[in-house]
Amino acid sequence: MPTIQQLVRKGREDKVVKTKTPALKGSPQRRGVCTRVYTTTPKKPNSALRKVARVKLTSGIEVTAYIPGVGHNLQEHSMVLVRGGRVKDLPGVRYKIVRGSLDTQGVKNRKQARSRYGAKKEKS
């Protein structure tokens, strides 16, 4: 434990908090343009074809973003909204595309957790 004199001389050093989403530059979301839409395989022990897109953000940084939900309408030059949030079994994927905003359509026939996937309430 330091003495008061040592604290007067040096002071306490603040902990450096490292951001998990540097490409968003402090924003909650960023707009971007898809440069490539493709599928990739997750790391062991999982097996699938995960849908991802390379997105050039308005902050000038190009990132890999995951496309959540079943089916999508994205292609090259689509305008998308990107939020933070990693995909645990895809190394290097630290962002997700927001469904139901800009050029991205919501998930069809979605009954539960609709707001996460941009799905409208079904007419009963």
Curated annotation (Swiss-Prot):
Tell me which InterPro entries the record gives. NA-bd_OB-fold, Ribosomal_uS12, Ribosomal_uS12_bac
For this UniProt record, the keywords arranged alphabetically read as follows:
Methylation, Ribonucleoprotein, Ribosomal protein, RNA-binding, rRNA-binding, tRNA-binding
Q: Where is this region: Disordered?
A: 1-32, 105-124
One GO location term (cellular component): small ribosomal subunit
The UniProt subunit note reads as follows:
Part of the 30S ribosomal subunit. Contacts proteins S8 and S17. May interact with IF1 in the 30S initiation complex.
> What positions are modified (3-methylthioaspartic acid)?
89
Query: What name does this protein carry?
Result: Small ribosomal subunit protein uS12
Give the UniProt family note: Belongs to the universal ribosomal protein uS12 family.
Instruction: Report the function annotation for this chain.
Output: With S4 and S5 plays an important role in translational accuracy. Interacts with and stabilizes bases of the 16S rRNA that are involved in tRNA selection in the A site and with the mRNA backbone. Located at the interface of the 30S and 50S subunits, it traverses the body of the 30S subunit contacting proteins on the other side and probably holding the rRNA structure together. The combined cluster of proteins S8, S12 and S17 appears to hold together the shoulder and platform of the 30S subunit.
From which source organism is this entry? Answer: Kineococcus radiotolerans (strain ATCC BAA-149 / DSM 14245 / SRS30216)
A Pfam cross-reference name: Ribosom_S12_S23
